[in-house]
């Protein structure tokens, strides 16, 4: 991953990145879990799981934080910041610093939804839609596997040569308590690896008004 995202960005692109709001994905996840445990329990299930149209942005922000936090802890082994951006072909950007040099990685976020939400969507449908992207030098695609992981074949993707993206990763939950998560990738490599990580714990820092 580090080798594929270490190219310097142009001054114009860097200025655009500097104007984004960068946040710590770990703190985003801690704040959300605190809200979930203390305020959301009595609400409708669609609201609790952020499955309404109005809450879609929140759900995607949480997924972006989950993926970025896992990558920071298990793959990059260095702190990562994340910023929302829906320009071009990506939903958010990860940023980290190694030896005083800034690295950026644009990420397109996809989801294989739960069977009770949309059982008709299969992973092959998502693979087919990925063919439209052209970011072989820097674009990373992350697919959230929101189904029972025991019944999902992590090695089901075969037509790697048809994609013009830099990397392809899966991530998802490993237990009902949502305390254990995994990353799997890059799927475009010959030997993808699985990385397991725990949902972060800590003190919330938001203020309700």
What are these regions (language model features)?
Residues 52-55, 101-107:
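A broad, low-specificity signal for short, low-complexity segments enriched in glycine/proline
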Residues 92-94, 105-113:
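Conserved catalytic cores of phosphodiester-cleaving nucleases, focusing on short active-site segments
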Residues 75-101:
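Long amphipathic N-terminal alpha/beta scaffold segment
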